[in-house]
């Protein structure tokens, strides 16, 4: 027979030639014992099985071995069942042809076609026909090489018990067959019990009831009204019963073909069943931007899986950085544990200190760590305020204030640059000065009561200047030893008998620098002569006045007068740049004398102070954020030299070890889940159409047709089977890609959680942290092993696909070449006979005419 059947039969004979106990006489009973399948496999892949150990009488084991090896190692789905081969004396011819055609497609590549014959040591004695088929019936030898359509139809009539679907009980056509755990299903019937989606090997597990299955990948995503749950049912209503069976067979054949790929990844299936939480248990947001969504109920970040709330709509693509929400939550928790000092503000609320978040967002009015420049004076306890009258100091401060204002008005070069060495943050002060005039000053009365109840030195309220409200520096006077008293309270507090409040030196420095920036912003800061310049001591006696103050101190003190100027009624005047001389110089009547000392004096002793809590507050406030500091000018090194005493311990950097960055672990280009499921939908529709056509074509082949039409139908049948195999192969690849991406995202989440855990200092670790570290490390190793197994399976599939593609190209080229050769040979033969005669005739005529012409 010259048709596809004869060609396939001849190929099987060549492959099984020389093997003991194998005689290929037809495409039915000759394959019943399974030795023919094993012989074909052994010729091309002798490493897969030992042919000498097989027995002709062990029909079940021979067929089982051949089907399993072909499915697991070669990716050829098992269309046949070993039990059918045992129960039937004459196997179905069309089933054998379809199955063997896949062997042919796999092994007839250019490199595998010329396989060597079996070794002589195997004693390949050709047995007699009777020994080849012990159960041969009288009519079987008549089938021989040429099986008539009647034989196909006769073989198609008896229905073996295993041809019924285990789910619906109806007949399973050849193109619909799917074997799962020893049972035969339609592909349409082999669905998840919960979401009705088609199951594929490696992505399902046993259901709650016997004989039921549940998908492990998409069940939580799709729900009952999901992507593929209702579509096949609607198609079943629209199509006839044969089409419905075709769709059922699609399920079986799809899964059956996918079993090939899944068999290569049995370890993956087992791992997904043992550890379902790694791939499917926790839901996850589909977009990386969904950081605001509530955390899911799980201890660790989840892979890219949509939550049940997104069942009706496919998830949006998620680039593999997935689930940063949980990582951010864990990072914030870890940050709180590691850097707890940065999360709380030790400054009391009456001081008007803004929160840390406000400091981060809004421009700073005065950095809290300016106290780091002048930390030594703050460690000395302040003296108790004397009880002398307020008059002399008021007069002295008035003179100091007036003198300072006059010098400011005249822009004396000796007075302007001197205050700047005490402020290494001039750039920040210049930025502050532009925004401060628009801020009104609040009333001074309400915050006055609270500091009085705490300590007399708290009488400096945050209402005298908008700057002092937004920085914790004014609280330093409670712990500073000697402070400079200015005319500030004369405008911010009513006359009273309470002791005069103190003002910290850094406040004076900042104010003087800010004022100088207003008058001459282009003038650079001057460097002080020495870090240990003697500061001016102004005792609280009537004899002291502004005359005893050095120009530097005089300038600083005069600038401090401006600090006390802005009150509820004097703010516009104080902030008017054009008229600095209009500042009010009313004497403050309720203040007691207070000693004056600038930051440079470190030798003056001071009596201890009763309370040290403000000092602790200042220390903690200095540690808030040491990384937002600007590079200090040349004055900061000299000032640091002055603080030779016990320097404050600088807080460690926020974070312990490497930075908390979620690493991307994707190996290939990321494919969004929406695209994956969209392509799987398209594949499923194509499989539905192919199975429907296959059912009709199978009925025609079994119904009987003439020889010419049967050959054409067989060619169409083989093409259909091959197309379906390609679709199933692509679906299996998509499933692997989906698993791989889930594992990659899970690995990124586990690594990030592990980084957050390791970022915590070991001294703060608990037993739970150590146990959690072990769990995360073990899970990380498991994820890496699973990813490696998937990559290996994908590589094997791609190699096999390349071989099959080369084989098909080679076959097409060979057929085209043979056709061209035949046509060329015919043309050349006809051309040569006529051409030769013409040439011979022309030559004779030319020779006969030549002598006559010469004569």
From Swiss-Prot:
Compositionally biased tracts (Acidic residues)? 425-434
Its biological purpose = Lipid-binding protein with higher affinity for phosphatidic acid, a lipid enriched in recycling endosome membranes. On endosome membranes, acts as a downstream effector of Rab proteins recruiting cytosolic proteins to regulate membrane tubulation. Involved in a late step of receptor-mediated endocytosis regulating for instance endocytosed-EGF receptor trafficking. Alternatively, regulates slow endocytic recycling of endocytosed proteins back to the plasma membrane. Also involved in cargo protein delivery to the plasma membrane.
Chain segments carrying region Disordered? 110-165, 226-253, 269-659, 815-855
Organism from which the protein derives: Rattus norvegicus
> What is this protein's name?
MICAL-like protein 1
Q: Where is the composition biased (Pro residues)?
A: 439-449
Q: How does it assemble?
A: Homooligomer. Interacts (via NPF1 motif) with EHD1 (via EH domain); the interaction is direct and probably recruits EHD1 to membranes. Interacts with EHD3 (via EH domain). Interacts with RAB35 (GTP-bound form); the interaction is direct and probably recruits MICALL1 to membranes. Interacts with ACAP2; the interaction is indirect through RAB35. Interacts with RAB8A (GTP-bound form); regulates RAB8A association with recycling endosomes. Interacts with RAB13 (GTP-bound form). Interacts with ARF6 (GTP-bound form). Interacts with PACSIN2 (via the SH3 domain). Interacts with DPYSL2.
Q: Please name the taxonomic classification of the source.
A: Eukaryota, Metazoa, Chordata, Craniata, Vertebrata
Ranges for domain bMERB? 663-810
Q: Which GO terms describe its cellular component?
A: centriole; ciliary membrane; cilium; cytoplasmic side of endosome membrane; endosome membrane; late endosome; late endosome membrane; recycling endosome membrane
Q: PANTHER family, alphabetically? A: CALPONIN HOMOLOGY DOMAIN-CONTAINING PROTEIN DDB_G0272472-RELATED, MICAL-LIKE PROTEIN 1
GO MF terms held by the record: cytoskeletal anchor activity; identical protein binding; metal ion binding; phosphatidic acid binding; small GTPase binding
> Domain LIM zinc-binding: where?
163-226
* Topology class, membrane: Peripheral membrane protein
| Modified sites of kind Phosphothreonine | 313, 316, 461, 463
């Amino acid at each position: 027979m010259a048709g596809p059947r004869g060609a396939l039969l001849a190929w099987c004979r060549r492959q099984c030639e020389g093997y003991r106990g194998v005689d290929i006489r037809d495409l039915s009973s000759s394959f019943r014992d399974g030795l023919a399948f094993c012989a074909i496999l052994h010729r091309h892949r002798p490493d897969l099985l030992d042919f000498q150990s097989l027995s002709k009488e062990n029909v079940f084991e021979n067929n089982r071995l051949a089907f399993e090896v072909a499915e697991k190692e070669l990716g050829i789905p098992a269309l046949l069942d070993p039990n059918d081969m045992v129960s039937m004396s004459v196997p179905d011819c069309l089933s054998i042809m379809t199955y063997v055609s896949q062997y042919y497609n796999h092994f007839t590549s250019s490199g595998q076609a010329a396989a060597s014959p079996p070794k002589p040591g195997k004693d390949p004695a050709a047995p007699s026909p009777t020994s080849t088929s012990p159960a041969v019936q009288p009519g079987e030898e008549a089938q021989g090489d040429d099986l008539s359509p009647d034989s196909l139809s006769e073989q198609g009539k008896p229905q073996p018990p295993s041809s019924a679907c285990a789910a619906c009980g109806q007949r399973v056509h050849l193109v619909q067959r799917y074997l799962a755990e020893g049972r035969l299903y339609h592909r349409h019937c082999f669905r998840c019990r919960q979401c009705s989606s088609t199951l594929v090997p490696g992505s399902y597990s046993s259901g709650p009831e016997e004989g039921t299955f549940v998908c492990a990948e998409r069940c939580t995503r799709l729900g009952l009204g999901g992507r593929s749950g209702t579509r096949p049912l609607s198609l079943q209503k629209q199509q006839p019963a044969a089409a419905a069976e075709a769709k059922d067979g699609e399920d079986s054949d799809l899964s059956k073909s996918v079993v090939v790929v899944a068999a290569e990844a049995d370890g993956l299936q087992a791992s997904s069943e043992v550890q379902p939480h790694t791939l499917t248990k926790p839901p996850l947001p589909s977009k990386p931007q969904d950081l605001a969504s509530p955390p899911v109920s799980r201890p660790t970040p989840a892979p890219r899986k949509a939550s049940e709330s997104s069942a009706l709509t496919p998830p949006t693509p998620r680039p593999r950085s997935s689930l940063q929400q949980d990582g951010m939550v864990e990072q914030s928790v870890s940050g709180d544990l590691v850097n707890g000092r940065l999360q709380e503000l030790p400054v009391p609320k009456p001081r008007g200190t803004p929160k840390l978040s406000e400091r981060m967002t809004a421009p700073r009015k005065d950095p809290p760590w300016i106290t780091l420049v002048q930390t030594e004076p703050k460690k000395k306890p302040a003296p108790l305020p004397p009880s002398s009258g307020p008059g002399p100091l008021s007069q002295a401060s008035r003179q100091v204030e007036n003198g300072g204002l006059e010098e400011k008005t005249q822009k004396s070069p000796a007075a302007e640059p001197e205050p700047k060495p005490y402020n290494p943050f001039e750039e920040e002060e210049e930025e502050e000065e532009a925004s401060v005039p628009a801020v009104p000053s609040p009333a001074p009365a309400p915050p006055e009561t609270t500091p009085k109840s705490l300590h007399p030195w708290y009488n400096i309220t945050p209402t005298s200047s908008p700057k002092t409200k937004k920085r914790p520096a004014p609280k330093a006077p409670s712990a500073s030893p000697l402070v400079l008293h200015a005319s500030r309270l004369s405008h911010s507090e009513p006359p009273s008998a309470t002791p005069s409040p103190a003002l910290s030196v850094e406040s004076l420095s900042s104010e003087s620098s800010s004022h100088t920036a207003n008058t001459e912003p282009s003038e650079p800061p001057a460097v002080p002569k020495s870090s240990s310049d003697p500061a001016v001591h102004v005792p609280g006696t009537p004899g002291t006045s502004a005359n005893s103050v050095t120009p530097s101190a005089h300038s600083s003190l005069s600038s401090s007068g401006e600090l006390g100027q802005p009150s509820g009624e004097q703010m516009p005047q104080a902030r008017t740049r054009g008229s600095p001389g209009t500042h009010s110089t009313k004497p403050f009547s309720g203040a007691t004398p207070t000693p004056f000392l600038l930051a440079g004096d470190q030798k003056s002793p001071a009596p201890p102070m009763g309370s040290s809590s403000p000092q602790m507050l200042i220390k903690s406030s200095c540690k808030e954020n040491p990384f937002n500091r600007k590079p200090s000018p040349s004055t900061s090194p000299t000032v640091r030299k002055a603080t030779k005493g016990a320097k404050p311990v600088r807080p460690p950097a926020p974070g312990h070890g490497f930075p908390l960055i979620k690493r991307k672990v994707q190996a290939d280009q990321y494919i969004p889940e929406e695209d994956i499921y969209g392509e799987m939908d398209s594949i499923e529709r194509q499989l539905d159409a192919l199975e429907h056509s296959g059912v009709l074509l199978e009925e025609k082949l079994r119904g009987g047709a003439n020889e010419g039409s049967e050959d054409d139908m067989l060619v169409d049948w083989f093409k259909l089977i091959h197309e379906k195999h390609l679709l199933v192969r692509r679906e299996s690849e998509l499933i692997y890609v989906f698993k791989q991406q889930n594992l990659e995202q899970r690995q990124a989440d586990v690594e990030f959680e592990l980084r957050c855990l390791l970022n915590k200092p070991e001294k703060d670790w608990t037993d739970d942290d150590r146990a959690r570290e072990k769990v995360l490390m073990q899970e990380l190793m498991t994820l890496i092993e699973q990813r490696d197994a998937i990559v290996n399976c994908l590589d094997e599939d791609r190699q096999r696909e390349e071989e099959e593609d080369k084989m098909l190209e080679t076959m097409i080229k060979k057929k085209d070449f043979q056709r061209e050769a035949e046509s060329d040979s015919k043309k050349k033969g006809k051309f040569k006979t006529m051409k030769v005669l013409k040439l011979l005739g022309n030559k004779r005529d030319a020779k006969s005419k030549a002598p006559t012409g010469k004569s």
